[in-house]
C-alpha cells in the first residue's frame, strides 16, 4: 500500500452534488482523464467544509492549520482508477494556498469564506463565487450515490501536461 502524504480532519462538510451533461463535462477535463459516471450519469459537487489538524506523514499537526475551504470537483478515472478532479479550490488561508499551489500544483485561490451551520440550515458565503443556503432534513444520508462520491482516495492533477 502506498504511503499517505497528508492527513487532515474535515468538519462541517456538505456535498451538494448534481448531474451534469457528460459531453459538456468531458470538454472541460484534461484529455487524459475520463469522466467517471454513476448509473451512466456524470456529476459535479460543490463541497464546503472546515479543515484542521493538517499534517504530513512525517510531522505533527501544523500550527495555524485550520481553514475553511470550498471546492468544485468532479469524478474521474485515470487508467481505470477512480479519483477526483478539482476545477477550483477556494480557501481562507493564504499560506496554505501558496504551499498547495507550489508543492502540489493545485488550483487554490484565496477567498473570504464564511461557513455557518445553525441546526439544519447550512449557509456558505464566498466573495469569489458563491452564496449558498441549504436546509438539510437528515444530516447523515448514506446512499449508493453518496458512497460513490465520497469513497475516493485519489486526486488527479495535470503537471507539465502529465497526469499526477
Residue spans for each PLM region:
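Hydrophobic, proline/glycine-rich low-complexity stretches
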Residues: 1-57
Amino acid at each position: 500500500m502506498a504511503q499517505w502524504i497528508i492527513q487532515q480532519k474535515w468538519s462541517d462538510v456538505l456535498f451538494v452534488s448534481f448531474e451534469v451533461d457528460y459531453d459538456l463535462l468531458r470538454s472541460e477535463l484534461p484529455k487524459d482523464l475520463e469522466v467517471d459516471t454513476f448509473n451512466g450519469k456524470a456529476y459535479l459537487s460543490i463541497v464546503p467544509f472546515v479543515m484542521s489538524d493538517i499534517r504530513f506523514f512525517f510531522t505533527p499537526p501544523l500550527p495555524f492549520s485550520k481553514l475553511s475551504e470550498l471546492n468544485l470537483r468532479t469524478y474521474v478515472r485515470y487508467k481505470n482508477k477512480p479519483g477526483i478532479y478539482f476545477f477550483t479550490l477556494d480557501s481562507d488561508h493564504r499560506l496554505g494556498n501558496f504551499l498547495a499551489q507550489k508543492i502540489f500544483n493545485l488550483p487554490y485561490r484565496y477567498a473570504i469564506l464564511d461557513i455557518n451551520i445553525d441546526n439544519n440550515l447550512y449557509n456558505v458565503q464566498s466573495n469569489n463565487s458563491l452564496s449558498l443556503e441549504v436546509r438539510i432534513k437528515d444530516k447523515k444520508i448514506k446512499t449508493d450515490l453518496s458512497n460513490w462520491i465520497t469513497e475516493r482516495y485519489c486526486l488527479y492533477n495535470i503537471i507539465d501536461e502529465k497526469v499526477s
